[in-house]
């Protein structure tokens, strides 16, 4: 499976992928990641405001992955995620479960499949208690309650909250909290994808 990751933002994005690593790329550039056969899942996200030295060590304002240019661990929250899982078919989503940093879209090459996007700038409407430098955090990450994190008593019955509704209203096709199962999409196995920052 091939992922073409494209930067349409008016600024540099340091893309990250598990698997895949990471890459600095400017507006208009593309980074291609080929997943090995049998790869069960992958996630991609964009990092902003990064500085790295010649050895690839440094830090990012949002989405930082342990201070490495080439990521081997998940990114720091908040970060808009493109998630992919392979089983009987492909399942994919744009996730705001870990918050939002930059707009993102997933475009399958199979045009019969849905192309979910989060094009809004959620940072512009982020409640002050969720606002952080470079992004808008999720209520679960900040408040850590079972209700916001869909844990314990809420594991099987976890309705949307006022916070997750802010994300959902801005980006109806994105996964807005842990139990927002309306926002996972399926496509035939063998499909390739492009992931676009600032679609």
Swiss-Prot record:
Tissue specificity remark: Expressed in pollen.
Gene Ontology biological process: pollen germination; pollen hydration
Disulfide bonds: 9-198, 50-60, 65-71, 113-187, 118-171, 126-136, 140-149, 150-158
Subcellular location: Secreted; Secreted, Extracellular space, Extracellular matrix, Pollen coat; Cytoplasm; Nucleus
Top-level lineage group: Eukaryota
Entry GO terms, CC: endoplasmic reticulum; exine; extracellular space; Golgi cisterna; Golgi stack; intine; mitochondrion; nucleus
Main location as per UniProt: secreted
UniProt KW keywords: Allergen, Cytoplasm, Disulfide bond, Endoplasmic reticulum, Extracellular matrix, Golgi apparatus, Mitochondrion, Nucleus, Secreted, Stress response, Vacuole
Induction behaviour: By air pollution.
Keyword Secreted carried by entry: yes
Keyword Cytoplasm in record: yes
Record family assignment: Belongs to the thaumatin family.
Record-given protein name: Pathogenesis-related 5 protein Cup a 3
